[in-house]
Amino acid sequence: MHIIPVIDMAATGINITRLRKNTGMTVRDLQEVFGFATPQAIYKWQRGEAMPTLDNIVVLAAVFEVTVDDIIIYRNQNQLREIA
């Protein structure tokens, strides 16, 4: 049996918000980094309604000066899914 980690989207969104604020960046600053026409995607990430693409997570890690693993939050061990 294998235990499969599951990303906690809400906690990851909270973490993205925390990391953004810790670096002193605004949502508009991130919008400019990504070249987005609107900030909606970033707000969705922060609310846990959507996940950034892997490419965007790598950019966030570089901007926040952290690792990719520092951005993504997984559900706790008791909530991990088991598969055969």
Enumerate the language-model features and the residues they cover.
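Residues within the helices of the helix-turn-helix
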Residues: 17, 28, 58
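DNA major-groove recognition helix of helix-turn-helix
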Residues: 45-46, 56, 75
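A short, Lys/Arg-rich alpha-helix, primarily the initiator
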Residues: 1-23
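Short alpha-helical DNA-recognition segment
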Residues: 24-44
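Short, charged recognition helix plus adjacent turn
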Residues: 1-6, 62, 72-84
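DNA major-groove recognition helix of helix-turn-helix/homeodomain DNA-binding modules
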Residues: 55-70
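The alpha-helix within a helix-turn-helix
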Residues: 20, 31, 61
